[in-house]
Structure formats: structure tokens, C-alpha cells
Regions:
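Short terminal alpha-helical segments
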Residues: 1-38, 105-116
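Charged, low-complexity surface segments at secondary-structure and domain boundaries
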Residues: 1-5, 39, 87-94, 137-145
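Non-transmembrane, amphipathic alpha-helical segments
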Residues: 3-9, 13, 41-45, 67, ...
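Generic structural signal for well-ordered, non-transmembrane alpha-helical segments
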Residues: 12-15, 19, 51-54, 58, ...
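Generic secondary-structure transition motif, activating predominantly at the C-termini of alpha-helices
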Residues: 22-25, 29, 61, 83, ...
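Amphipathic, non-membrane alpha-helical rod segments
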Residues: 32-78, 121-153
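Repeat-associated, polar segments at repeat-unit boundaries in modular proteins
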Residues: 63-101, 154-162
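Long, mid-chain structured domain cores
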Residues: 84-126
């Protein structure tokens, strides 16, 4: 993530993700595609996940006052579409949230286990783990916002990760 952040790119990614969210939440794939895939497409879109959408929604909401009116309209449309899909497919949507949170925490556990044998390497490749943890936090906050019961196993994994 050495590229410079832009609201426009973040908004484009959000729109692509939300436009594919309906099909994604009903499917089996955990790390989906936001469109434009293929070897020759030059697609640099991040994976489509509920957590990735939630992170962009929150980040762009915090930056709303820096958007021009067209960007604000596009953002509002994405917020509305996301809310509609999350409500219409609630069971599928929350199922994906849970699966993603566990998957990301499991990946982090593996990372920390590998770090114990090579701390120098760990310091050099920590950035993806920060993103994983950020997305897990977005999922956790969304669970609270929709009053979704949080499993004890998830709480334990989260606590274990944070104690590393």
C-alpha cells in the first residue's frame, strides 16, 4: 500500500464492491471479486469482503466533508445500496461477517506464530496484519451496531490476537 490515498479511488473501490455485494453475500466464496478480474484485466481491486466494504464505508464517512457534491452523491448511493443488501440478505451477510472475522484472526495467529521464529522478518511484513486487524475491528463494531450476538470463540480469538 505504497500508493497515495485518494478519496476517488476509495470511492471507486467501494462502488465496485457494493455493486457486486448482492451476489457475493449469497455465494460461498469468502474473499470475493469486485469485478474486472482476469489475468489481462490489470485489476488492482482489493478482495470483496463484508469487512472491506465496512472499512471503506466508515473511512469515507469520516472524509465526507472533503468530498465534492458528486462524490457525496455517489457515496450516499453506495451507503443506501449496502444497507438494502445487508438487510435483504441479513443471514447471508452476517454469516460472511463471522466467517471473515474468524479467517482473518486465524491468519493473524499463524503470522504471530511465524514471528516467534523470525522476529526480524515479522517487523518487515507487519502492514498486512494491521489491515487484517482493522477490518476485524470494523466487523466487530458492525456486529454491535446490528445487535448481532458475538460468539465466545470469536471473543477469545480476538483477545488472543490482541495479546500478541
Amino acid at each position: 500500500m505504497s500508493e497515495t490515498y485518494t478519496i476517488e479511488r476509495d470511492l471507486n473501490e467501494l462502488e465496485a464492491m457494493v455493486n457486486n455485494l448482492d451476489t457475493y453475500v449469497r455465494g460461498e466464496t469468502l474473499y470475493g471479486n469486485a469485478g474486472g478480474s482476469g489475468f489481462f484485466s490489470g485489476n488492482k481491486m482489493p478482495s470483496l469482503t463484508v469487512g472491506a466494504v465496512l472499512m471503506r464505508l466508515r473511512r469515507l464517512d469520516m472524509l465526507r466533508d472533503q468530498m465534492d457534491s458528486k462524490q457525496q452523491q455517489r457515496f450516499g448511493a453506495s451507503v443506501d445500496k449496502h444497507a438494502h443488501i445487508a438487510g435483504e440478505w441479513r443471514v447471508h451477510y452476517t454469516g460472511k461477517m463471522n466467517r471473515e472475522a474468524h479467517s482473518r484472526l486465524d491468519a493473524m495467529r499463524t503470522f504471530f506464530e511465524e514471528c516467534s521464529s523470525d522476529p526480524k522478518l515479522c517487523a518487515n511484513v507487519y502492514r498486512p496484519e494491521m489491515l487484517r486487524r482493522t477490518i476485524v475491528q470494523e466487523i466487530r463494531m458492525a456486529m454491535d451496531e446490528i445487535n448481532l450476538e458475538v460468539e465466545d470463540e470469536f471473543k477469545q480469538k480476538l483477545s488472543g490476537t490482541d495479546s500478541q
